[in-house]
Every structure is written in C-alpha cells, then in structure tokens.
C-alpha cells in the first residue's frame, strides 16, 4: 500500500473520503478552486449512485477520483468475492458516469489484508492509505484539525480528510 511519496518539494496530497455528500462537496470544491488546489476524492459507490451530479462536478473541477468501495464495510469482514464485487461495482458506476475508470482505491477505515491485496492486484489497482490524518470525523474544530495535520506534516505526505464531516472547507484552506 502507498502511504506517502518520497519528495524533496514541499508538496502533499489532499485526499477526501466518503463523498460525494452535497452540499459539503460543493463547498469543498469552491474552497479548493479559490486556493488553486486539486485533491483526490475517494468515493463510495452508493453515494455515486445517489449524487451523480456531485461526482460530475468533482471531475469537471479537475480532481482525481478514486474508489472507496460501494458500501463502506470493512474489507476484512468480507469474502474474496464480496470484496471484488465492492471494487468492481463502484468502479463500474464511476466509469459509466464519467467515461473513465478509477485507478486508485482506499479501503474503508484503512483496513486491509491479504484477500484485499489479491483482489486489488487482480484489478490492477493500488491501495492508497495515508500517513497524516486530520481525524475530522472525531473533531469538528477546523483549527484543531489543521494543527493536528501541520504538527507532523512532511513533503510527500498523504493527508486524509472527509467530504461531509464538520466545517469541510476550513482545514484545507488553512
């Protein structure tokens, strides 16, 4: 699994899980555009079905779209065939909507095991984890989330945030 990318430049990857979640997604897209920042959105398949216009808005804004499973169940609790179904179903939904298949996957809760690795290898998708976690599902104060990220951030870090938790635009803007 990829948890960071070795870089000398002061560059990090902003990633957002669990979307799309209108109206949070739109507010997040506006904030990212104001700051000239692109991000990777790891989308849940059931949200792709429910909010196709938000998925299209994310893609049209130039952000990368990754697969975050269909139902957001922990992959470790699923059979090999159920894992594969979660991956394929979500990738198919995204491809049918956007004309492009996602190439990245982030497991729900960051949990993975040998069965998931086998399924991802079969589908040619890397697992993208994170090494900087804003814990924005526990904390709603944007300043505390931002400080948590900034106290340990380094070039090449992959930062985990969520589309739809708390004041979504504040930590990224800071």
Language model region names:
Residues 1-78, 82, 86-93, 98-100, ...:
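Active-site beta->alpha N-cap acidic-glycine motif
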């Amino acid at each position: 699994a990829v948890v960071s990318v070795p870089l000398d430049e002061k560059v990090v990857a902003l990633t957002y899980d669990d979307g799309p979640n209108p109206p949070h997604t739109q507010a997040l897209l506006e904030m990212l555009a104001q700051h000239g920042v692109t991000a990777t959105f790891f989308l849940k398949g059931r949200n792709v079905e429910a909010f196709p216009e938000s998925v299209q808005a994310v893609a049209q804004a130039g952000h990368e779209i990754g697969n975050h499973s269909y139902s957001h169940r922990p992959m470790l609790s699923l059979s090999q065939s159920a894992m594969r179904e979660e991956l394929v179903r979500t990738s198919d939904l995204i491809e049918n909507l956007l004309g492009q298949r996602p190439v990245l996957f982030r497991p729900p809760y960051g949990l993975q095991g040998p069965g998931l690795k086998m399924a991802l290898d079969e589908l040619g998708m890397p697992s993208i984890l994170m090494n900087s976690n804003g814990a924005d599902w526990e904390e709603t104060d944007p300043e505390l989330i931002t400080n948590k990220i900034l106290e340990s951030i380094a070039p090449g870090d992959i930062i985990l945030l969520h589309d739809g938790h708390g004041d979504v635009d504040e930590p990224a803007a800071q």
